[in-house]
Amino acid sequence: MSSNECFKCGRTGHWARECPTGIGRGRGMRSRGRAGFQFMSSSLPDICYRCGESGHLAKDCDLQEDKACYNCGRGGHIAKDCKEPKREREQCCYNCGKPGHLARDCDHADEQKCYSCGEFGHIQKDCTKVKCYRCGETGHVAINCSKTSEVNCYRCGESGHLARECTIEATA
């Protein structure tokens, strides 16, 4: 796609904001193809961030005042443009949701769930039931696994060796 083509319809002679096709209003996705960027129209409706309604964008909204700023609570601007000092937010524990500590320091250890074994009472870094990704058994890791896994060569497709050990010449 050349730089003077419309990003909505791909034709020359106008820009996307003036596109007569009315496709999408800038919601299209560009995908990388062999010939460069190609436009794929998206059926997602336009949603106004000012009022939350679909069918138009904030610049076309009848509602003049934005929703309240997340920083100061007043309307007319968004948090990134707020003139008030940035409000400090206290970090909360992901385990119990209370402020003042992080999950790794949580007193509610019996409620902590391990992402490795799925049991309660500890977190993954403290898990004693390590799981081998090679054989799927618990109690050891892959480097210490006694079960050999079948390896396949990416060069020739045969099993039993890796590409770096392959005797077949690489084709360009």
Swiss-Prot record:
| Zinc finger map (CCHC-type) | 4-21, 46-63, 67-84, 91-108, 112-129, 130-147, 151-168
Q: Does the keyword Endoplasmic reticulum apply?
A: yes
Main localization is nucleus
Q: What is the source species?
A: Gallus gallus
Q: Name one GO biological process term.
A: positive regulation of cytoplasmic translation
Tell me which Pfam families the record gives. Answer: zf-CCHC (PF00098)
> What is the designated name of this protein?
CCHC-type zinc finger nucleic acid binding protein
Q: Which residues form a coiled coil?
A: none
State the organism's lineage. Answer: Eukaryota, Metazoa, Chordata, Craniata, Vertebrata
* InterPro entries associated with the record: Znf_CCHC, Znf_CCHC_sf
**Molecular function (GO) terms listed?**
DNA binding; mRNA binding; single-stranded RNA binding; translation regulator activity; zinc ion binding
Q: Which UniProt keywords apply?
A: Cytoplasm, DNA-binding, Endoplasmic reticulum, Metal-binding, Nucleus, Repeat, Repressor, Transcription, Transcription regulation, Zinc, Zinc-finger
Role, per record: Single-stranded DNA-binding protein that preferentially binds to the sterol regulatory element (SRE) sequence 5'-GTGCGGTG-3', and thereby mediates transcriptional repression. Has a role as transactivator of the Myc promoter. Binds single-stranded RNA in a sequence-specific manner. Binds G-rich elements in target mRNA coding sequences. Prevents G-quadruplex structure formation in vitro, suggesting a role in supporting translation by resolving stable structures on mRNAs.
PANTHER family in alphabetical order = DNA-BINDING PROTEIN (PTHR47103:SF8)
Subunit composition and interactions? Associates with the 40S ribosomal subunit, the 80S ribosome and with polysomes.
Gene Ontology CC terms: cytoplasm; endoplasmic reticulum; nucleus
Instruction: State its location(s).
Output: Nucleus; Cytoplasm; Endoplasmic reticulum
